[in-house]
């Protein structure tokens, strides 16, 4: 499978996952999430879903537990929406890049304040 196709599938999967999680999954533990990236392996067997959660650490943990519990439902919904022979296995990962970017931005602002 080509890398470009895996990237296209990942982009489409990102859109579909946002819709499924926001509108179909009814678990109250799922907080306000943003899917930042979906990386699909070239053979389409695994999709790593990178996301951020607005809230404290407990809300982040609760959201990931709820997503793990709803993984089967999410995968079946994804399968009915996308034309794939095999729906990739979903692996949810917390994306630390937003926090890291905010930390760097704060450091830059602090440096400008000192000048």
Curated annotation (Swiss-Prot):
GO terms for molecular function: ribosomal small subunit binding. GO terms for biological process: maturation of SSU-rRNA. The keyword Phosphoprotein does not apply. GO terms for cellular component: cytosol. The keyword Cytoplasm applies. PROSITE patterns: RBFA. InterPro entries: KH_dom-like_a/b, RbfA, RbfA_dom_sf, Ribosome-bd_factorA_CS. Keywords: Cytoplasm, Ribosome biogenesis. It is found in: Cytoplasm. Transmembrane segments: none annotated. Its main location: cytoplasm. Pfam families: RBFA. One of several proteins that assist in the late maturation steps of the functional core of the 30S ribosomal subunit. Associates with free 30S ribosomal subunits (but not with 30S subunits that are part of 70S ribosomes or polysomes). Required for efficient processing of 16S rRNA. May interact with the 5'-terminal helix region of 16S rRNA. Monomer. Binds 30S ribosomal subunits, but not 50S ribosomal subunits or 70S ribosomes. Belongs to the RbfA family. This is Ribosome-binding factor A. It comes from Staphylococcus carnosus (strain TM300). The gene is rbfA.
